[in-house]
Amino acid sequence: MNRKFYLKTIIATLLFSLSTLTAPARGGDFTAGKNTFLLNGQPFVVKAAELHYPRIPRPYWDQRIKMCKALGMNTICLYVFWNIHEQQEGKFDFTGNNDVAAFCRLAQKNGMYVIVRPGPYVCAEWEMGGLPWWLLKKKDIRLREDDPYFLARVKAFEAEVGRQLAPLTIQNGGPIIMVQVENEYGSYGVNKQYVSQIRDIVKASGFDKVTLFQCDWASNFENNGLDDLLWTMNFGTGSNIDAQFKRLKQLRPETPLMCSEFWSGWFDKWGARHEMRPAKAMVEGIDEMLSKNISFSLYMTHGGTSFGHWAGANSPGFAPDVTSYDYDAPINEYGHATPKFWELRKTMQKYNGGKRLPDVPKPAAPIITIPKMTLTEFSPLDLGMSMPTTSHDIKSFEEMNLGWGAMFYATKLPQIEKSSRLSLNEAHD
């Protein structure tokens, strides 16, 4: 063989090999077929683990995703939290721990698909359900309704989400197989026009080819169900699974079934005991669903921590949530496998196509012990107040252009002749 031709052949082969290594993944497809999801035309059961990237320090993302894969999951499900990305109106941040696109790419690197739930409302025991505080500066705003200003701001946010994540849909070679429209809206109101507008905004943001769905409870999913969206149910451990899907199967007898939130535990409120749910009920529920080819997302598989002021509150009344979002999940707050994890892993192994599940990764960081300490100094609460102002009534945070933190109120009460009780009702942010 001519030596020059031989060298050209080797170089061409190497260049071709390098190009195949660096080329983007070819586009695929994920659709709703007859009684099953179809991944590139083949039946597919979604086994999703709910993780929230803002509740996990970025250096630990990879270990948490690997933990989910070792549990037998094939998909990561996540919310996109509007208020952490747009803390000031018009200023978007998708960097550092907010880099949701990097989180999705990391999931793909670990062989996982992704379900994206971009709200605009997400609940999740998160500050204002993910809605930015500055929306309330407009006093007549109607949140989660067809309010022109609200929808305009939703459109701007979802457009930014699209810039980050639309290139990562499965049709573009990425891991995103499904995108959710709104969130459990049936438990909030009845307004198909509003839900339709959110659907249109999501589509216009670049999610026009990916499978779109909406989630609700069995008791209210018909309130706002749109004909062109996939419908999924949310329910917890101990539920009668056939009963949860009964009405849906009557309306859509050939639709693939999915529990988009199967609650592994529950959240904790200030002053209450730590919520716990038995592993047996969770494992039996997942076993039953998988035996019937019902897809699911385990909410939460790992809860993490609501850092800073991001923990939300529940109503009626005022029931603030603690910063720990442990949720009694199979992977605890600091990323370790719990007894629930090991029990569920045994069941998930049965549905892994005869292949051995990946090894469970080591913890991302050791648990440290903080020694006892004595506090010897203090500071007055009103020291260093930066925005003193006088008002005839109590001003809200939004009226003071504040999103988080603490506000110190002081007043002089009139002198009274006899003792009385002073009540401050509903005084909270």
PLM segments and residue spans:
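N-terminal carbohydrate-binding accessory modules
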Residues: 24-75, 105, 109-111
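Bacterial N-terminal signal peptides that target proteins for export
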Residues: 1-11
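Bacterial N-terminal signal peptides
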Residues: 10-20
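Substrate-binding/catalytic cleft of secreted carbohydrate-active enzymes
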Residues: 116, 120-153, 159-298
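Aromatic-lined substrate-binding rim segments of carbohydrate-active enzymes
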Residues: 61-127, 199-210
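Carbohydrate-binding surfaces of carbohydrate-active enzymes
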Residues: 151-180, 186, 191-195, 199, ...
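Conserved residues at the C-terminal ends of beta-strands
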Residues: 50-52, 79, 182, 302
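Aromatic- and acidic-residue-enriched carbohydrate-binding clefts of CAZyme catalytic domains
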Residues: 79-91, 96, 124-149, 316-328
